[in-house]
Amino acid sequence: MEPVIRVARDADVTAISGWTHDTFEWGDYIADALPDWLARDDAVVLVAELDGAVVGVSSSRMLSPTEAWAQGTRIHPDHRRQGVGMSLAPALEVWAREQGARVMRSMVEDWNEAARSQSLKLGYREVAAWVRAGRAVGENSPVPEGNGGRRVPPAEGLRPAHSSEAASALMSWSGGELERAARGLLPIEVWRMRRLTPADLSEAAKRNGLLTGRPGWALIEQRDDALEVPWLACEETDAGAMLRALVDRAAAAGKEELRVMIPAVPWLVAALERRSFEIHPLRIYAKPL
């Protein structure tokens, strides 16, 4: 029996939360996210119904006038590998095209072979490899020898850049190894990506979120307990100095953790490993619409 695909309603959230609370070892975020997704004008949430019961859910959101993001696909444990996900995906693509999207992207964790295989079956192509990395601030922080164990700021720090410097930041990244590996993408709210624009850098500078210094450039976002770095531009020889400066910046802001989202360029991943970051590989998929 083919499932009925329809737009989700607020009343569906309770049913969905009942079979998604233990999707992963740590649980699942989907039940908490659905109310916000349902309320957004730039997003759609679709469900698959069989005999009146919701057995699948998936969502898409417009991140720019031409870029859509697929997210939150979940299938009831009793109905997996029965084509429910294959039925939801085309309906999401129809919605995205109607909004003006020319591409749909998604993110899959490296370990999730089932989701990666499903992406390929749906006509997506793997376009980039990224990593999500984090470490506690204070643990293994830069401590020069002979100072009695006290942290001191690194010699090469980062300062807030002026919005007039945004063009220079973009130029330092454009056409380089990091831009190519990233496929020109910028993480939005950590777990979504769209093309980086000059306005992203200039607007960040206006709120002191664009940093610069001899090691390079970085975007930062303040979270309650962490400093997030969704974008940086540096050379291989400066990767260590850049990460050290970001650790210091997070410590100075009183954060407990530094988190970065970067393309999986080998020398940058190696620099993260040398500084005790916990690294989680990610795959980015894209499909023309």
Identify the meaning behind each predicted range.
Residues 11, 20-59, 177-210:
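Active-site rim helix/loop that mediates acceptor-substrate recognition in acyltransferases
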Residues 47, 53-61, 69, 74, ...:
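Conserved beta-strand in the GNAT
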Residues 62, 105-109, 125-139, 278-289:
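Conserved catalytic-core motifs of GNAT/GCN5-like acyltransferases
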Residues 62-70, 80, 220-230, 279-282:
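A conserved beta-turn-beta hairpin within the catalytic core of GNAT-like acetyltransferases
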Residues 75, 81-94, 98, 117, ...:
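Conserved acetyl-CoA-binding loop-helix of GNAT-fold acetyltransferases
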Residues 86, 98, 110-128, 264-279:
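Conserved active-site alpha-helix within GNAT-family acetyltransferase domains
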Residues 96-111, 118, 252-263:
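Conserved GNAT acetyl-CoA-binding A-motif
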Residues 123-223:
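Amide-forming acyltransferase catalytic core, primarily the GNAT-like/NAT-type
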